[in-house]
Regions:
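A short, basic/flexible loop-to-alpha-helix module at the beginning of a structural domain
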Residues: 194-206
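Phosphate-binding glycine-rich loops and their immediate beta-loop-alpha structural context
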Residues: 200, 209-227, 234
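Short, conserved phosphate/pyrophosphate- and ester-handling motifs at nucleotide-, phospho-/glycolipid
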Residues: 136, 217, 311
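Reductase modules of NAD(P)H-dependent flavoproteins
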Residues: 1-79, 84-85, 239-339
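Ferredoxin-reductase
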Residues: 98-188, 207, 245-247, 268-272
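Short, surface-exposed secondary-structure boundary micro-motifs
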Residues: 50-53, 90-92, 144, 195
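Fe-S ferredoxin-like electron-transfer domains
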Residues: 64, 71-123
C-alpha cells in the first residue's frame, strides 16, 4: 500500500505491507518518522489523515488522548492502511542517518527464561538472522495470540548478534507480562520489530556518563555499560550509575553491576540501607533514585551525558533534576519511558 507523508520540510513516499502499521513501514523504509514509545502510549507519532482510510488497531490506546479524531488525527503506530494514504505530520522529518540501524521485522525463539526477583523475569531471544543495534536501543515484542507489541530494551550489546537479552517486570493486567509469567515460555516464539530508540551510546561520545534507572529501566543501561566496558571507556571518562528499587528483594543484576568500572549506587525507596551486603563494590542509599542521584552528583555535572529510563514518573522526576539542578542541555539528556 502506497503512503505519502508530508512533513514540515518535505514529503516522503513508501510502501506498507498488508497489515503493517504506518509507523513501522516508514521506519523500515529508512524514514525517521516521529515516535517515542512506538506502542500507543505516548502520542508522539500522531499524524493527520488527508486522504485514504486507516484502520485503528488499538482504539483504546492511552496515546489517543493526544489526538483529535474529528480532525483526522491518528497514531501512526496503531494505524493500518486500508488503501493508499496521504498524511501530514507537524514536525520536521529526515532520513535515518547513514550507518544507522534500520528497523526491521524478525522473529526468534525464547530461551534461558529465569526469575531474577519475585516479579522480574529475564530471557534471551535467539533470532532467525543476525541484527545490528546500538547500545541503549529497544525492540517491540509480541507473542502469538496477543495483539500489539510491547517495548523492551536490550540488556546486552552486540553488532551483528543473533541473541537479544531482556528483563521484564510483571505488570498487573499487562497482557505480555501475564503471558510471560503464566507458564514456562522456554522455546516460545516471539515476533519482533526494531531496533528503535535514540537514547544510545557510542564510545566516540567523549563525555562522562550518568545513568539513572528505575526498576527494569536498568535493562538499557546494562547495554550501554557493556558497550562502554568493551571499549575501556571508563579508563578515560568517569561514570555513575544510580539504580532505584523499592527494597533489596526487588534488586537484580547486582553481581553484574559489581563488575562495572563506573561508580554504582543502589537507591532503596522503601527500606533502610542494609548494614552489610556481599556487594562490597556497590553503594547503597535510602531514597528515591532521582533524589539519591541529586545528592551524590552535586558539583559533578561537567561534561556529562545523562541516560534515564524507568516508569514515567521516575523518568520525569530525574529529568527535572537534570534540567533544573544539573543545568544539562536537552541534547545531553537521553531517556526512554515505557507505560
Amino acid at each position: 500500500m502506497r503512503i505519502q507523508v508530508n512533513a514540515r520540510n518535505r514529503g516522503y513516499d513508501f510502501d506498507a505491507l498488508p497489515g503493517e502499521r504506518v509507523l513501522y513501514a516508514g521506519l523500515r523504509a529508512g524514514i525517521d518518522l516521529p515516535y517515542e514509545c512506538a506502542t500507543g502510549t505516548c502520542g508522539t507519532c500522531k499524524a493527520k489523515l488527508v486522504s485514504g482510510r486507516v484502520r485503528d488497531r488499538w482504539p483504546g490506546a492511552p496515546g489517543r488522548k493526544y489526538v483529535k479524531p474529528q480532525a483526522g488525527e491518528f497514531l501512526m503506530c496503531q494505524g493500518e492502511a486500508e488503501e493508499a494514504l496521504t498524511l501530514e505530520v507537524s514536525s520536521f522529518v529526515y532520513p535515518l542517518e547513514p550507518g544507522a540501524c534500520v528497523p526491521q521485522s524478525c522473529s526468534g525463539t525464547m530461551r534461558n527464561v529465569r526469575a531474577l526477583t519475585h516479579d522480574v523475569t529475564a530471557f534471551a531471544l535467539d533470532l532467525e538472522r543476525p541484527r545490528d543495534f546500538d547500545a541503549g536501543q529497544f525492540v517491540l515484542l509480541a507473542p502469538e495470540g496477543i495483539d500489539g507489541y510491547r517495548a523492551y530494551s536490550m540488556c546486552n550489546y552486540a553488532r551483528g548478534g543473533r541473541s537479544l537479552d531482556f528483563v521484564v517486570k510483571r505488570k498487573a493486567g499487562g497482557a505480555f507480562s501475564e503471558w510471560l509469567f503464566g507458564a514456562n515460555r522456554d522455546g516460545a516464539r516471539l515476533d519482533a520489530f526494531g531496533p528503535l530508540g535514540k537514547a544510545t551510546f557510542e564510545p566516540g561520545l567523549g563525555k562522562n556518563l550518568l545513568c539513572i534507572a528505575g526498576g527494569s529501566g536498568l535493562a538499557g543501561m546494562m547495554s550501554i555499560l557493556a558497550r562502554a566496558e568493551a571499549a575501556n571507556y571508563f579508563e578515560r571518562h568517569q561514570g555513575w550509575v544510580f539504580f532505584g528499587v523499592r527494597t533489596m528483594k526487588d534488586a537484580f543484576f547486582l553481581q553484574e553491576l559489581s563488575h562495572v568500572s563506573a561508580e554504582v549506587t543502589v537507591a532503596l525507596s522503601e527500606e533502610d540501607v542494609p548494614r552489610g551486603t556481599q556487594w562490597s563494590k556497590l553503594r547503597f542509599e535510602r531514597g528515591l533514585v532521582h533524589e539519591v542521584a541529586k545528592r551524590a552528583m552535586a558539583g559533578k555535572y561537567q561534561n556529562v551525558r545523562a541516560y534515564v529510563a524507568g516508569p514515567p514518573p521516575a523518568v520525569d522526576a530525574a529529568i527535572r533534576v537534570l534540567l533544573l539542578d544539573a543545568k544539562l542541555t536537552t541534547d545531553n539528556i537521553r531517556y526512554d519511558k515505557f507505560s
